[in-house]
A protein has these predicted regions:
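Acidic, Ser/Thr
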Residues: 13-19, 72, 82-88, 144, ...
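Flexible, low-complexity linkers/stalks enriched in Thr/Pro that connect modular domains
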Residues: 1, 53-62, 125-135
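Extracellular fibronectin type III
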Residues: 49-50, 121
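Intrinsically disordered, low-complexity tandem-repeat regions
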Residues: 22, 80, 115, 136, ...
Length: 188
């Protein structure tokens, strides 16, 4: 069989330059994992011996993938997911072989990869922290009819966690305009 790194079983065969050699248990051994096997043999003259087969290149372990993100905080920007592995020579078989994927919106992407011994796997990158929508404000007034009293304007939003500069209320002592400045956690 092979002496290259593999995720398959390896077959070792012992051969001799004489035909009168008998191998106890047969001259073939299949390794399902790395290790050693001792072939015991005897020839027609009664000479005995051993031959040791050693295999160290079976790798049936899937490379461990780690996915990191450019940010996990709420953001109004794209998010880049990067994949890395605990083994060298791992090849990404989709995404044009790139180890990064850029999310322009929330969702998921499945990286597909193969390790140096041929072990194939997948890892899913998930993003749910992208918010590119500006919060929609609603302004309400405590008095809506003509009045000679102060009027309080209150701003509310269609989403939570919106910060309003100088607070979410403004008291009008006279007729006029006021601009509320606000930002959500993602920076919109």
């Amino acid at each position: 069989s092979t002496t290259n790194s593999t995720n398959e079983d390896v077959t070792a065969t012992v051969t001799f330059d004489k035909e009168d050699v008998i191998v106890d248990g047969g001259n073939v051994h299949t390794f399902t994992e790395n290790g050693e096997f001792t072939f015991r043999y005897i020839d027609s003259a009664g000479n005995t011996g051993t031959a040791i087969a050693k295999v160290t290149w079976i790798d049936k372990t899937l490379p461990k993938a780690t996915i990191t993100y450019s940010t996990t905080n709420p953001t109004n920007q794209d998010v880049m997911a990067s994949i890395s592995f605990d083994k060298e020579d791992v090849t990404i078989t989709n995404n044009d072989g790139n180890n990064t994927y850029t999310f322009t919106e929330n969702g998921q992407f499945e990286f597909e990869f193969v390790g140096p011994a041929g072990n194939r796997g997948t890892a899913i990158a998930k993003v749910n922290n992208i918010d590119k929508d500006v919060p929609v404000p609603t302004i309400s007034y405590d008095i809506t009819n003509p009045t000679n009293q102060n009027v309080t304007a209150t701003i509310t939003f269609n989403e939570e966690n919106v910060t309003v500069k100088d607070g979410n209320t403004h008291v009008f002592e006279d007729s006029g305009e006021y601009t509320f400045e606000f930002e959500d956690r993602a920076g919109n």
